[in-house]
Every structure is written in structure tokens, then in C-alpha cells.
Curated annotation (Swiss-Prot):
One of its GO terms (biological process) is NAD biosynthetic process via the salvage pathway. GO terms for cellular component: cytosol. Catalyzes the synthesis of beta-nicotinate D-ribonucleotide from nicotinate and 5-phospho-D-ribose 1-phosphate at the expense of ATP. NCBIfam families: NAPRTase, PRK05321.1. GO terms for molecular function: nicotinate phosphoribosyltransferase activity. The keyword Ligase applies. This is Nicotinate phosphoribosyltransferase.
Length: 389
């Protein structure tokens, strides 16, 4: 189900480098969230535990290290040496099942546990469809679907990346998707978040930061200072590379209130992951103009539950206003005639050092349906941020 230590999304490795550099003593706990309350089949946890144990066998090969060194110019020699000796520790993952309810937690040093989320979700997804005897569409029909999507995106000149590792139907289907898209002569695929597939198909690995980076800074520095300290720390770690900032962890309103000229010029653009995308375009364009920055020199990366029609609709509102690209996930890797799992694994708690107290980590987003974390802490965060506005 997992093919390599690099069968993971790039932003997990980039964040791991930053954590290893800046926050090596931080401990974290992640929790699996089954948003749709999907019932899991009998003995699912037992089968999942077998897959988790198998993860300890993956190591970075010399060829993979050479690939990262040549391709990912932002990865430091220190980090690559660390990753070369990294192994997954199954003891960091706790899996249990009560009737049809699945529970998964990941706990340990942040710089180690950060790599679990994506492959673990990919395993849960693929294993679920195996154990429920899901019947996907015939391969040739899936290929036609893949090609039709690629043609529409190409005809509309939409630059997009595959972001579908976490909720893919299968590893083999994921690989077939990339192969199908690349078979189209004038495709507009700019890369994939999956580092292993980027290596295999010689396309660009794509990704910067996830919500957990900013969520942690909310614990470290308080909710009002979470965004500015998170982007400043990112700049310290990468010196201007990987310059796409995520806006919605504590709402875009709060993000823009501290996204000043320095960081607006330093960062290449922002990522939209919740809320109304059209209203978001207007706000971001206006914000850059207020800072005397030409919006057409900046980029918005859209990644909020996209399908092809949504991408076309959004793109039409960006033309001649701001650059745009799209991270399309489940709609690419799990549009095979089954219902994809609606699940996430999110940072739930962290402590700044082993001797420090644990604190709840939360995310607001621009969509209340995507709020995650302890309900009391969410209410406290909202009060704190409202007082500061």
C-alpha cells in the first residue's frame, strides 16, 4: 500500500526539516477524525496494525537521497543525513476499534512523528476499500475519466498539481492517474505532492506547509501572534524558498491583519483551503494593492475540496488579476465509482519540551465545518481573536 519512505507528501518533509532545525524538543499528539462517521469493518484495526508495523522497514535509499539532494534544493545536508537514518517507529501509533468505530493516535517527538499522517491515511483508505470488497470502475473507464479531466484542465490553461495521496483509492491507481495525465500531449500538470511519484515520473514535487505548522505557533506564541511568528519561522528555515503561506488556520481575517509588506513581498503567494474562493480572490488582490504590490506578480494556490468544474470557475475569476494554481486531491485519485472516506488526521496536542505541560492545538479555518480541536479551546481562541480585532 505504501511503496517507499518517499510515498508521502512533500510538505511533511519540508515541515520536518523546519521542526528538526527550530523545534527539536517539541512533543505532539495527532488524532484521527472520521468526519463522516463511516463504519469500519470487523478486525479493521488489527489489519491496520499489521500495516503500521510494516512501516518500520522503509529507509531512504542512496538513490532516493541523491534524488532529494538534486531536486529539493531547499533541503539541507544536515536534514538529508537525518532522513537517511530515519525509520518509522510503530510504537508511536496507537490503533483500536470499538465495534465499527476506529481510533488512531500518533504521539511522540514532533520531528519524528510528523511523517506518519499521510501514509497512515493512505493505508486507512486503501485498506478500507480492500476489506469492504469495493468494486471500482473498470481500468479503461477510469483512464477515460482521468484523460477527460486532464483535457478540460488543459483546454482552460489551468495549472494544477496532484494532491491526492491521503484519500486515494489505491497506490496503483494513484500511479496510473499520473501516467494517464502525462500521456496527454499538452497536459498542464505542474507536479504532484507525492515525492515518490514525482521521482518516478520526473515531475516536480510540490508543497510547503500545512495547518499544523501554524497551529503549533498558536500554542507557542498565542493565537494573535500565531500567523506572523509562523511565517517568520518559515522564512528563517527556508530563506524565501517554499513561499506559499497558508491563510485560514485562525481565519483569513486574522492572517491578513499581520501579513505585512515584508512577508507579502517575501512570500510568492498564499493558499486557499476553506471558505468562499471568489471572495478570497477579491480580498487577497485588495490586500496586495493596499501594500502597493502588483497582484499579478503573486499566486493563489487553491486546494479546498476541488473538482474540475470548481477549478474552471475559480480560474475564470483570477484571469488578469492574480496568478493561480490548483492542488486537486481526492477528485483525481479516488473518482473510481466508490465513495471516498471523509477523514483527517490533525494535530491535537503539543508541548514545547518534554518537561513542559501539554496544550490543546486547534484550527478555526474559514469554514466552521472544518474547525478542529477541543471545543472549549476553540471558544477561548475565538474570544481572544475577537478582542484583538
Amino acid at each position: 500500500m505504501i511503496q517507499s519512505i518517499l510515498d508521502n507528501d512533500l510538505y511533511k518533509f519540508t515541515m520536518q526539516q523546519a521542526v528538526h532545525m527550530l523545534y527539536p524538543r517539541v512533543d505532539v499528539e495527532y488524532e484521527f477524525i472520521n468526519r463522516s462517521n463511516t463504519p469500519f469493518p470487523k478486525d479493521f484495526a488489527q489489519r491496520l496494525q499489521v500495516e503500521v508495523q510494516g512501516m518500520k522497514n522503509f529507509r531512504l535509499t542512496p538513490e532516493e537521497k541523491e534524488y532529494l539532494d538534486k531536486t529539493c534544493y531547499f533541503m539541507t545536508p544536515v536534514y538529508l543525513d537525518f532522513l537517511e537514518h530515519y525509520t518509522f517507529d510503530p510504537d508511536e501509533v496507537t490503533v483500536s476499534q470499538t465495534n465499527s468505530e476506529l481510533s488512531v493516535t500518533i504521539k511522540g517527538p514532533w520531528y519524528r512523528t510528523i511523517l506518519w499522517e499521510v501514509p497512515l491515511m493512505a493505508i486507512i483508505s486503501e485498506l478500507y476499500f480492500v476489506m469492504t470488497n469495493a468494486r471500482p470502475l473498470p481500468d479503461e473507464q477510469i483512464r477515460v475519466i482521468n484523460l477527460n479531466k486532464a483535457k478540460i484542465l488543459s483546454c482552460n490553461n489551468i495549472r494544477y498539481a496532484d494532491f491526492g495521496t491521503r484519500r486515494r483509492f489505491s497506490s496503483s491507481g494513484h500511479e496510473a492517474l499520473i501516467r494517464d495525465i502525462l500521456a496527454l500531449e499538452h497536459n498542464t500538470l505542474i507536479g504532484t505532492s507525492n515525492v515518490n511519484l514525482a521521482r518516478l515520473f520526473n515531475i516536480k514535487p510540490i508543497g510547503t506547509m500545512a495547518h499544523e505548522w501554524i497551529m503549533f505557533h498558536g500554542v507557542l506564541n498565542g493565537y494573535r501572534m500565531a500567523n506572523p511568528t509562523a511565517v517568520a519561522a518559515w522564512a528563517t528555515a527556508f530563506h524565501g524558498h517554499l513561499g506559499i503561506a497558508l491563510t485560514d488556520t485562525f481565519t483569513t481575517d486574522i492572517f491578513l491583519s499581520t501579513f505585512d509588506t515584508l512577508h507579502a513581498k517575501l512570500f510568492d503567494g498564499v493558499r486557499h483551503d476553506s471558505g468562499d474562493p471568489i471572495a478570497f480572490i477579491d480580498r487577497i488582490v485588495d490586500h496586495y494593492k493596499k501594500l502597493h504590490i502588483d497582484p499579478i506578480t503573486k499566486t493563489i494556490v487553491f486546494s479546498d475540496g476541488l473538482d474540475i468544474d470548481k477549478a474552471v470557475h475559480i480560474h475564470n475569476h483570477c484571469i488578469n488579476r492574480i496568478r493561480d494554481s490548483y492542488g486537486i486531491g481526492t477528485n483525481l485519485t479516488n473518482d473510481v465509482g466508490v465513495t471516498p472516506l471523509n477523514m483527517v488526521i490533525k494535530l491535537a496536542k503539543c508541548r514545547t519540551a518534554p518537561e513542559k505541560d501539554w496544550h490543546n492545538a486547534i484550527k478555526l479555518s474559514d469554514d466552521k465545518g472544518k474547525h478542529t480541536g477541543d471545543s472549549e479551546e476553540l471558544a477561548h481562541c475565538i474570544k481572544v481573536l475577537e478582542r484583538g480585532m
